């Protein structure tokens, strides 16, 4: 199906236009669960509602012959409207799901009518035929419910028809019908979902400069050729053979955080939509764990450092001998002082080295590359600063970075000269 929509632009565009009307309504995510639990969605006996209808109609007709019977008609109207309101309040959510049931069926009908369902055209037609007139059975009830929220007139008509209990009877009939057609409906839902996913992936692939389908192997490694970040315009691609735990160092804004995010994104894309933004991508299947873009939480009283500690602990608790864990960490323990950060980071990374995991860490701490030399491989990004400009090539190089650019950036951004001079002196003293 994916190949079909990659190659056939016209059916893809038609299907996209139809699927837009389906939208991203939150209730759609719960439709399969609703259909699987229809037994709990019955609103009562149709016979009971029919009896109340007959009593109301009988009292009205009788009142035309004998005025003394009219009060009974009023009582029955009050009883019916009370039954309607209480039942509707109790089952409002379930009744609203019926509107989404119809929406999915209508989407399937439009896809088949426009002949843009590709490889699943026949399957959709068969499922729609099996479902029969379910959409018409529900359609009028759904339209009336929508109108009841749109105007005062709609509210009045809702209560007027509520007296007849027509909506409750229609809903109960729909539930019983859907129970008998449960499998057909769920298969229709799944096929439309697969079609939607295939179009999304095909459209994503068309938007990329180039892509590849991943290759999975049994080696504990990830091989990336000319890989890039999919959200960057005119991205710079890099290659890497990642078979050992590694530390990525680099100056500010040199590209290390973007690189590790690109790695994480492609690891996820490879195992979900079989698409990688690279010339070639090989990997061992595994769970992906990240600690990046950490933020404090004022409402919960959690500092940046505490949040990061929770992220890292979650990683450590996920390790198992049965499944490889691939960990990607941006600026490890950034939220604490330098001395303790380096000590704690080394201890954590030493522990990870002994586990069934593959680790990539981005860090400003050159000291870590020295302390972990021999156990962690080193890569870096760098830059070139002139008198009036700064140039980043965003290329990944082997080895650890040997210099920073923070003080150079102070000068480049035209900070007062005395600040730049003092910063240089302080660095010299510490070295």
Predicted stretch roles:
Residues 65, 201-431:
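ATPase nucleotide-binding head domains, primarily ABC-like/P-loop NTPase cores
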């Amino acid at each position: 199906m994916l190949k079909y929509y990659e190659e056939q632009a016209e059916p893809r565009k038609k299907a996209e236009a139809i699927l837009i009307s389906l939208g991203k309504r939150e209730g759609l995510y719960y439709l399969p669960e609703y259909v699987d639990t229809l037994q709990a969605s019955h609103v009562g006996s149709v016979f009971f509602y029919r009896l109340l209808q007959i009593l109301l109609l009988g009292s009205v007709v009788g009142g035309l012959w004998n005025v003394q019977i009219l009060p009974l008609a009023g009582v029955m109207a009050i009883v019916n409207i009370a039954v309607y309101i209480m039942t509707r309040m109790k089952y409002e959510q379930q009744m609203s799901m019926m509107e989404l049931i119809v929406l999915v069926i209508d989407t399937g009908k439009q896809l088949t009518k426009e002949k843009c369902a590709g490889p699943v055209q026949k399957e959709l037609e068969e499922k729609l035929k099996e479902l029969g007139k379910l959409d018409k059975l529900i359609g009028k009830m759904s339209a009336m419910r929508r109108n009841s929220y749109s105007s005062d007139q709609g509210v009045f008509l809702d209560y007027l028809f509520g007296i007849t209990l027509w909506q409750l009877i229609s809903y109960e009939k729909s539930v019983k019908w859907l129970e008998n057609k449960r499998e057909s409906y769920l298969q229709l839902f799944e096929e439309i979902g697969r079609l939607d996913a295939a179009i999304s992936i095909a459209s994503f692939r068309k938007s990329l400069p180039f892509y590849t389908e991943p290759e999975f192997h049994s080696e504990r490694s990830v091989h990336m050729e000319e890989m890039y970040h999919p959200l960057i315009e005119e991205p710079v691609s890099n290659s890497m053979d990642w078979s050992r735990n590694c530390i990525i160092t680099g100056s500010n804004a040199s590209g290390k955080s973007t690189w590790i995010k690109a790695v994480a994104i492609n690891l996820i894309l490879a195992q979900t939509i079989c698409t990688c933004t690279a010339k070639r991508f090989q990997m061992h299947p595994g769970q992906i764990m990240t600690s990046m873009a950490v933020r404090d939480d004022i409402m919960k009283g959690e500092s940046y450092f505490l949040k990061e500690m929770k992220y890292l602990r979650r990683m450590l608790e996920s390790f198992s001998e049965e499944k490889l864990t691939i960990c990607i960490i941006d600026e490890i323990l950034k939220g604490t002082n330098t001395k303790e950060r380096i000590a704690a980071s080394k201890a954590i990374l030493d522990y990870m080295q002994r586990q069934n995991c593959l680790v990539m860490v981005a860090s400003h701490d050159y000291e870590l590359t020295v302390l972990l030399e021999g156990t962690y491989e080193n890569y870096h990004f760098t830059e070139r600063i002139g008198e009036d400009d700064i140039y980043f090539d965003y290329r990944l190089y082997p080895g650890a970075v040997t210099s920073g650019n923070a003080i150079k950036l102070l000068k480049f951004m035209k900070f007062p000269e005395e600040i730049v001079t003092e910063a240089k002196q302080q660095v010299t003293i510490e070295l």
